[in-house]
From Swiss-Prot:
Pfam families: HK
Name recorded for this polypeptide: Hydroxyethylthiazole kinase
Residue numbers binding substrate: 46, 195
Similarity-based family: Belongs to the Thz kinase family.
InterPro entries: Hyethyz_kinase, Ribokinase-like
Swiss-Prot/TrEMBL catalytic activity: 5-(2-hydroxyethyl)-4-methylthiazole + ATP = 4-methyl-5-(2-phosphooxyethyl)-thiazole + ADP + H(+)
Residues at which ATP binds: 122, 168
Alphabetical keyword list: ATP-binding, Kinase, Magnesium, Metal-binding, Nucleotide-binding, Thiamine biosynthesis, Transferase
Organism superkingdom: Bacteria
Gene name for this UniProt entry: thiM
GO molecular function: ATP binding; hydroxyethylthiazole kinase activity; magnesium ion binding
Keyword Metal-binding among record annotations: yes
Essential cofactor(s): Mg(2+)
Amino acid sequence: MFSTGTVWKNVAAVRQRAPIIHSITNFVVMNTTANALLAAGASPIMAHAPEEMAEMAGIASALVLNIGTLTKPWVESMMLAGMAARERRLPVVLDPVGAGASSLRTTTALEILEKVRPAVVRGNGSEILALAGAAGDTRGVDSARTAHEAVDGARALARRYGAVVVVSGAEDVVTDGDALWLVRGGSPLMPRVTGMGCTATVLVAAHVAVAADVLEGAVTGMAAMSAAGALAARRSQGPGSFQVAFLDVLHSLDLVTVRDEVEVVRA
């Protein structure tokens, strides 16, 4: 069972151990996700040059591959980084942004799944369904499917690739192909701010880097995200002030907030 105590344990561990998260991510969210990692107590590296990927694997605690603004050189860097991480047994978290919206995105995400074998895949309902082989109805990089509509696809994807799959939504779903966990919290403001999904991905990576196992890290990373989002929404007036409030809350997140703002249940 994962409790609020488990969530808090990993929140505190991230602050204490400051895991280095190597993130090859998209132009839209680089600043946002780097600041979120810093606020949570982790240490971001946003390197993407192919020539330094092997060296980055030597110092990182986890790797994030985010396909939001793909180009061929970035695909090369992602594959080099992913293979180096696999060789060193570093956890890799894949964010298949917009999978299903274009063949480049879908084939790249599937190639990473096949060759790198990420520990975690985090996406919205449409992205997960697209990778699972169903019609995901992807609307750009946004989802036309709820997390619950993607449960069967998430389980199938997890079993196929031996990964933990996280489906973000009003209620987040986390599965290793067998167990299914629901994370309840957050705020309707979160989808109104770009980069919140990508932020969830890097927080999951930070938690996986310190957790007892991958499933625990995925659940607690999403729970920390939801708790911070819920409290930040009450302290803000709209999407603009929410972004600032979210970083502040993430930085000062405490056990009381975790206990009061998020619920983690096994389905």
